[in-house]
From Swiss-Prot:
Protein name, as recorded: SsrA-binding protein
UniProtKB keywords: Cytoplasm, RNA-binding
Record gene name: smpB
Molecular function in Gene Ontology: RNA binding
Main location: cytoplasm
Pfam families per the UniProt record, alphabetical: SmpB
Length: 153
């Protein structure tokens, strides 16, 4: 099962508490697949939403394919995500809760098929982010001190 990661949304883990992750297929056009294989995609500011029983992805940027012609795709078009109906209904129920959102974490190819990892997430407050940074810095300091101590012995 070969997995080739195309793009990751690194900011998502900093700005949101990840509660649960899901895998969905991406419904793409031909030139979009070629651009994705070339790694020309961005998940910045993108999000997913359930509308009329369909799971849709907004604001994902896939650059137009360089060798494409006039039938090239629109870079930020709304794309359909493919999941089982019961999974979509479950997500619809969960996203109705206040403060929960569907955030894409990464896009990858799995067995030749374009997939996206979605996260059910809750936005972090500024003080939560500061706490995370402080704990990470403290952990680094401790690791550095242990490493220094080991070097002396």
């Amino acid at each position: 099962m070969a997995v080739k990661v195309v793009t990751e949304n690194r900011r998502a883990r900093h700005e949101y508490h990840i509660l649960e992750t899901f895998e969905a297929g991406l419904a793409l056009r031909g030139t979009e697949v070629k651009s994705l294989r070339a790694g020309k995609a961005s998940l910045q500011d993108s999000f997913a939403r359930v509308e009329n029983g369909e799971l849709l992805l907004y604001n994902m940027h896939i650059s137009p394919y360089e060798q494409g012609n006039q039938f090239n795709h629109e870079p930020k078009r709304t794309r359909r995500l493919l999941m089982h109906k019961y999974e979509i209904l479950r997500l619809m129920g969960k996203t109705r809760e206040k403060g929960l959102a569907l955030i894409p974490l990464k896009v990858y190819f799995k067995n030749g098929l374009a997939k996206i990892e979605l996260a059910l997430a809750k936005g972090k407050k500024i003080y939560d982010r500061r706490e995370d940074i402080a704990s990470r810095d403290a952990r680094r300091e401790i690791d550095r001190a242990i490493k220094e101590r080991m070097r002396l012995h």
